[in-house]
UniProtKB/Swiss-Prot annotation:
Protein name in UniProt: Uridylate kinase
EC top class, as a word: transferase
Key word ATP-binding present: yes
Role: Catalyzes the reversible phosphorylation of UMP to UDP.
A GO CC annotation given for this chain: cytoplasm
Main location: cytoplasm
Gene name as annotated: pyrH
UniProt-annotated binding residues for ATP: 12-15, 55, 59, 163, 169, 172
Residue span of region Involved in allosteric activation by GTP: 20-25
EC number: 2.7.4.22
UniProt organism field: Limosilactobacillus reuteri (strain DSM 20016) (Lactobacillus reuteri)
Subcellular location: Cytoplasm
MF-aspect GO terms: ATP binding; UMP kinase activity
Amino acid sequence: MADIKYKRVILKLSGEALAGDKGFGINPPVLKDVAKELKEVHDLGVQIAIVVGGGNMWRGVTGAELGMERAQADYIGMLATIMNALSLQDALESIGVPTRVQTSIEMRQIAEPYIRRKAIRHLEKDRIVIFAGGTGSPYFSTDTTAALRAAEINADAILMGKNGVDGVYSADPNKVKDATKFDHLTHMDIIEKNLHVMDTTASSLSMDNHIPLVVFNLNTSGNIMKVVTGQEVGTTIEGD
């Protein structure tokens, strides 16, 4: 059995990652692949919590284009994350992985409300927990949600799965050919160099609570397993 570096993790999944090449909505083959990889890691004994974004369904810029109030647009985004969470729950349970969805906005007919102690108990009972609805408040990103929940459940690390990007670069590698990839950074590097890995609130939360962050390409099969077993994948961000 492989050695486990991170026993309890938060996986931050962007909505775009679930859309895959489609760019919008949910791509069923991608969803199935993610679920299969998560099952392999879960079967290893790793406790997994997931924070999902909603960018494949709704973008804040869309609300701005409509002249919508920021708070209203953010609430729509929260609902988008819940749709993604329920889809991922179904994909996981269809392959035998017990999964619970907890939402920061109560909707008891379809999910549990977020309760910290209950979430931890689910993890201890080897259930995957998906946190949906962001923080439940507008003006906070799902990156901030990941950092907040990681601190609350005492996660060993935040795993940030990116769509087609294999780590943190000095510039957008899709636009700048000679962009430099970083293997290791500190949380302060992210803030000072304005590297746009997470927003400043999320980076500060991670730094203050000493939570490592690993940024990696979700589209490469086996990467989640490599990260939790301590193999060199993507970019590791830790320390002040």
